[in-house]
Amino acid sequence: CLRLVYRVAGAGTKEFSALTAGDTIDALGPLGNGFPLLEGKKAFLIGGGIGIPPMLQLAKALNEINGSEMVQSVIGYRDSHMFLKEEFEAYGLVTVATEDGSVGTKGNVLDAIRENDLKADVIYACGPTPMLRALKAYSQEKGILCYLSLEEKMACGIGACLGCTCETKGGEGKSRIGLFMRSLLGDSMNTTSIQKVESNRFSRA
């Protein structure tokens, strides 16, 4: 069973929202590279907004490898509409932040981490660009490995059109997110890369 979670943000997702049971669509995937599954490390799985659903399968996989006590999901919502929260709870500990303070910590995921004095050895994150930028800075402050899943325009999805390039550090130039770098080691990214992604947030169909 394949479940798709999406936000209406462009022509493609608008067409998705008009589909009904029995309609047929063409699909290409999975594309790019996923997160590395590190053994023996306590992990923060951090999701915000539409970046929450991709973290659920990761929570399941890390639970199978390391056990639920090594999986700490930190999820950021706008309000008390906490989709998928109960499913995350099946695979580890869950801490919630809401923008309006209706549930959990009032604020963002970093506020929740600090308020609850949470600790981990590695960060996996997917969500809005300001969140990713803050998590990159936090990981450098704490000396924690950090993997960020970026949002970018995906025209072809396989890196051929070069529409999804992201600038990296160390003279490596640009990497094609659609082909190689769907999940990036946070320290390899230029700050300008994260800013570039922010300008294209939710623009993918």
Predicted segments, located by residue:
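Histidine-anchored nucleotide/phosphate-binding helix
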Residues: 54-64
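Ferredoxin-reductase
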Residues: 1-21
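A short helix->loop->beta-strand "cap" motif at the edges of active sites that frequently abuts
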Residues: 66-70, 143-144
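Reductase modules of NAD(P)H-dependent flavoproteins
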Residues: 74-205
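Short, Lys/Arg- and Gly-enriched loop/turn segments at beta-strand edges
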Residues: 32-41
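Extended interfacial segments that mediate partner engagement and assembly in macromolecular machines
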Residues: 25, 30-32, 49, 53-55
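Residue-level marker of beta-strand positions
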Residues: 21-24, 163
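Conserved beta-strand elements of the Class I
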Residues: 43-46
